Design a protein with these regions (language model features):
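Accessory terminal helices/loops
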Residues: 11, 19, 225-227, 239-307
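Cleaved targeting-peptide boundary
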Residues: 18-25
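Conserved beta-strand hairpin/beta-sheet module of binuclear metal-dependent hydrolase folds
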Residues: 30-81, 184-196
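Divalent metal-coordination and catalytic microenvironments
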Residues: 32, 57, 67, 82, ...
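Acidic/histidine-rich helix-loop elements
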Residues: 37-52, 126, 130-133, 203-213
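Active-site HxH/HxHxD metal-binding segment of metal-dependent hydrolases
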Residues: 75, 80-162, 181, 257
Length: 307
């Protein structure tokens, strides 16, 4: 029995090692802004939900954190990486949108003030039970009595609000519908840094499902590219420079115009794959998970616009 117990303990230890999170990639942007970059998959039982990026902005007495991870365990893992660059507490969390991989981890930071757009806050408040259930099912991680943090401070739709938080000047931009109806862009004018949420992703197939692609292209053109950007932390993937933003904009713009052209010429949804430059999309992560649903979503969007 003693040997069986030892074997069981070893199996448990081996299992724990097997599912350990990969290290957070910490990138210093400047003396007070750091990117915490994670893997780029979709939440599943292999990655246990660690698929996200976070921006750390070190203020006078505390940290402003952009997004919070998929759940408490992921947030704890990211926080350990944060503590390698500063011991200051997280006092504010800026949530870029309501998708659960970006905010369910906020409950880990019990004393932090959470800010988001009005739409995002409503989605979290009304949908938190299903969000928790879905993330638990997808990742196999049990959250116990998870109680997602509903944002206490909200940004009105379509507004641009300048704020000073912890001595740091920020502009919080609630743009038109892009990745979702309630995206929040966080602009640091003194640093030239933009945290875009999933309005921008890098080497990752974007998710069009909850947004509007034509409007999304407009947000990149009229809002993001109007800023004197030096560095972008996207929702997923490596840091971006201006050339990367323009390349992404052109890809999603071509995607929309290809679907629209086929529709207006009385083609079929099945024709889209024959006309898109699929090779460039295949080179990016999440291709298999996203391409079919993205084509369908944009086809329905174009159909509605021309009904």
């Amino acid at each position: 029995m003693r040997y069986l117990g030892l074997i069981f303990s070893l199996l448990l230890t081996t299992s724990a090692w097997a599912v350990a999170y990969p290290p957070v990639k910490v990138e210093r942007i400047n003396e007070r802004v750091y990117a915490m970059l994670g893997p780029t998959g979709i939440p599943n039982k292999d990655n246990r939900g660690f698929v996200n990026n976070n921006l750390v902005i070190i203020g006078d007495e505390g940290i402003i954190l952009v997004d919070a991870g998929s759940h408490r365990d992921v947030a704890k893992h990211i926080h350990a990486a944060i503590r390698t660059v500063t011991e200051k507490p997280v006092t504010h969390i800026l949530v870029t949108h309501h998708h659960s991989d970006h905010h369910l981890g906020a409950e880990y930071y019990e004393d932090a003030e959470v800010l988001a757009t009005e739409y995002c806050a409503t989605q979290i408040r009304d949908g938190h039970v299903s969000m928790v259930e879905s993330m638990q099912r997808r990742t196999g991680v049990s959250f116990g009595g998870a109680n997602p943090s509903v944002p206490q401070t909200t940004i009105p739709h379509g507004s641009r609000q300048e704020m000073v938080i912890q001595g740091v000047r920020l502009e919080l931009i609630s743009a038109d519908t892009a990745h979702t109806k309630g995206d929040l862009l966080i602009w640091l004018p003194d640093d030239g840094v933009l945290a875009s949420g999933d309005v921008l992703v890098h080497y990752v197939n974007p998710n069009f499902y909850d947004g509007n692609l034509k409007s999304w292209v407009g947000v990149v053109d009229n809002t993001i590219l109007s800023l004197p950007i030096k560095t972008v932390m996207p929702g997923h993937g490596p840091l971006m420079q201006l050339d990367d933003v323009i390349r992404f904009r052109n890809m999603i713009g071509d995607f929309y115009s290809t679907v629209e052209k086929i529709y207006l010429e009385d083609g079929e949804e099945a024709d889209v794959r024959k006309n898109l430059d699929l090779e460039q999309w295949k080179r990016m992560d999440r291709y298999d998970a996203m391409i079919g649903r993205n084509i369908n979503k944009v086809w329905l969007e174009v159909e509605e616009a021309n009904f």
